Amino acid sequence: RLCDGTYCEDQDFWRLSGVARQSYLYKRNKTTNVNDIRFIAGLKNDYKDGTIFIKKETNGNVAIRYRLYDKEGNLVLDATSADKQNLYEVKNVHQWNAENPYLYTLLVDVMRKEVVGKGKGKNAKVNYTTVGVIPFKVGFRNVSIQGSQVWVNGQHVFFKGANRHEVD
């Protein structure tokens, strides 16, 4: 029953324990940092303009500056916010697809917010000190499944291939 010729469940996958890819540990400020950040990049207006929805959890008195650069290094978005969620629009984006995987660089500047002087409310003077920068790669695309077909940016995609498990 359990000889070499019998079917073994998950025979196409070598189950290893431990870390299988490169891993990094980052030291961050305990009192002022980003605990979690997520973003969803999509397309609108006939796939011409991009949207980026950002949701974050921070601790401490933190403000975040978002800077989005295209491949050529041009700044296409610069915004600062202390809100937990933000939605930004980027005009005339390059679409990401399998043939042209165009990626933008999103830099998330974590800034400590400090009130300076005796002013209160809107009259208070605030200083921002950057305590860290977190980089991300962002691709603007819409992916959907319609029936049994996969669509990327309004174009049907035909997949060929088989399982692939990365084992060195």
Give the positions of each predicted feature:
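Secreted/periplasmic carbohydrate-active enzymes, especially glycoside hydrolases
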Residues: 1-168
